[in-house]
Amino acid sequence: MAKNKIRVRYAPSPTGHLHIGNARTALFNYLFARHNKGTFVIRIEDTDTKRNIADGENSQLDNLKWLGMDWDEGPDKPGNYGPYRQSERREIYTPLIQELVEKGLAYESYKTEDELTAEREAQKAAGEAPRYVYEYEGMSDDEIKASQEAARAKGLQPVVRLRLPKDHVYKFDDIVKGEISFESDRLGGDFVIMKRDGMPTYNFAVVVDDHLMEITHVLRGDDHIANTPKQLAVYEAFGWEPPIFGHMTLIINTETGKKLSKRDESVLQFIEQYRELGYLPEAMFNFIALLGWSPVGESELFNRQEFIKQFDPRRLSKSPASFDQKKLEWVNNQYVKQSDPNKIMDLSLDSLIKAGKIAANPDSKTIEWARHLIALYQDQMSYTAQIVEMSDVFFEEPEQLDAEALEELNNETAPVVLKEFSERLKDLTLFTAPRIMQIIKGIQKDTKIKGRLLYMPIRIATTREMHGPSLPDSIELLGKDRVLAHLEKTLAEIK
């Protein structure tokens, strides 16, 4: 590996599906690596076996690929720094933990969970911040050894804790936030680096992995800032050089003004949910890339290569990023409008089939009808699943006209227009949009009725709606029999 070549990683836990915030972390690391012709690594942090979910890893990787990201090393792309799952690296961690114990930089702790809970409650009652109290205070080496042997004889399993130096300051220069420092005495005491089951804790394993995988930069959410001093303590214990850190600001829900939380059901937060609705991966990539990072210039629409060319972590915002659902819909609409109609057809048809509007495995005639229908709405859709709601008039028989529509028809010319239109449609053999438009223009010429007084009654009567896409195309898609029935029904309602 060339000296100083940038290596970054995205290290998800398979405890859930790909969240917007995690997707942003992956995307920024990906852009940073590609901009600098570096290496992008995927590492699965699966040591929390109680919280891992079935298919969690596959979901993470599949959705990253869907967004348009690729990686150079990972569980499915072995490189020279594997394994790429923490659960497969246990034999790497164990001797390193033992090394720290032998050097006196870490030690076995046999305090039970009940004892630790009682300790924290007493501290809380005294108005003190909770912290681990060293259990061997004042003991000689022989006394410590005897205490540990007695605990083992009782069948107790130890954790291993890293010994923190007193009055020490952990300092790092963050790419986003500048210099940050923590005092060792405020970190809650010596912290666990190996759990009772022999597995390393996150703050130990992540340091070992980043060091051995030669990670040069760590870009992650600022909820990890509190972990950084503990990780620096592990780096110092081994005498290793830490990577350069950059902590991205939180993502705020624009509607609530609060941090985007997985428990907040007021907004969709998982990539799979947007895939199901027919959002386009290029649009999602574009939108997520602007959550807390600003390019040069005023444009808000970029393709992947443009983002790679521009990406500079020094342009990451120090202020929280706003997750605006309406903005996402706008961005996706821009991409939908520019997309190949065949692509939008496939996504929209899938939504119509899932909604039961069109039968599975439709015949060629139905497919062509659907293609015409979907093309009518392509420019209007924020996401392709919207076709189901937008096109409801073509699948469901309408209810009575509402008061606003009836008021629009409450004039002398509306019945004239509708009767003329109905009579002329009956004689129409080629029921196509151009021929329908000819009839409308013929009515205008013969009756001198034009504009809203001409088009609105026809739209309301035929589609039973006051707004919609191209009127002649809509009438063609509804079909002659349905349109004539709608006209008859409307004329009866306005008598």
Curated annotation (Swiss-Prot):
4Fe-4S: present as a keyword of the record? no
Q: Which parts pass through the membrane?
A: none
**Entry EC no(s):** 6.1.1.17
Q: Where does ATP bind?
A: 262
Q: Which UniProt keywords apply?
A: Aminoacyl-tRNA synthetase, ATP-binding, Cytoplasm, Ligase, Nucleotide-binding, Protein biosynthesis
- Tell me yes or no: is Protease among this UniProt entry's keywords: no
Which reactions are catalysed by this chain?
Answer: tRNA(Glu) + L-glutamate + ATP = L-glutamyl-tRNA(Glu) + AMP + diphosphate
> Pfam families from the entry?
Anticodon_2 (PF19269), tRNA-synt_1c (PF00749)
Molecular function via GO: ATP binding; glutamate-tRNA ligase activity; tRNA binding; zinc ion binding
> Which parts of the sequence form the motif 'KMSKS' region?
259-263
Alphabetized HAMAP family for the sequence: Glu_tRNA_synth_type1 (MF_00022)
**Assembly information from the UniProt record:** Monomer.
> What name goes with this protein?
Glutamate--tRNA ligase
Per the UniProt record, the source organism is Latilactobacillus sakei subsp. sakei (strain 23K)
Gene name of the encoded protein: gltX
